[in-house]
Amino acid sequence: MSEPTIEAPQPATTLPRMLIGELKVVGTLPEGPVLLCGNHVSYRDVFLFGKVRASARLLVHPLVFSFPFLKKFALRWGFVQVSIDDAVALLKQGQTVAICPTGLVEALGEAELPFKTGAVRIAQQAGVPMVPVYFHYGRYPGRWVTPFSITVQNIILFCLWPFYRQGVTIIVGAPMDPAGDVKERTKALKAAVDALKPEMRV
């Protein structure tokens, strides 16, 4: 493993409620190892996969582990560095792994960034289903942030988090078979995640 991991992740509880407010989960997961694949509309998303399954290990950017203080909490929360080999190994051990296929945060709260193929490749190599997850926040900024880069948008959101502390609904979709052409399955995964957006559901 790229970084040591603790046997049982301890998901953050107080911090998400402080940053987000009320949390609600809709849907259930199948038993056994799965790859959770979620949209990435806020830096706060990283705390939410543990609400879907407490033992889930989230793949995060290596930069997170470069800060000693942050690394301490990242390990406690079950975060691991992004690595296809490590993710596959964890899944084959029977653990649940989580990933945001866009990699970057979609600061507008809209599905505008493409999914990378890593999620499908991980699920295929591990032989586990992918489970689409959608994070729907109670309030999110409008198009007024579009003139700014995604980095600046996220700085704005970080500074204004009390204003956007309106709760979140975590919507869990049906498991997906990863078998098939990687690019096509990646498109299908993105469509499945996007379809969970409340406005699009029937």
Question: What residues fall within each predicted segment?
Answer:
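Short low-complexity, flexible loop/linker segments enriched in glycine and/or proline
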Residues: 73-75, 98, 145-149
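Helix-to-loop junction immediately C-terminal to a conserved catalytic motif
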Residues: 6-40
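Soluble, non-transmembrane catalytic domains of enzymes that act on hydrophobic metabolites at membranes
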Residues: 1, 108-117, 184-202
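Catalytic-site beta-strand/loop segments enriched in glycine and acidic/polar residues
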Residues: 90-120
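Catalytic core of membrane glycerolipid acyltransferases/transacylases, capturing the structured
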Residues: 28-86, 109, 141-142
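Residue-level preference for the first positions of well-ordered beta-strands
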Residues: 33-35, 96-100, 131
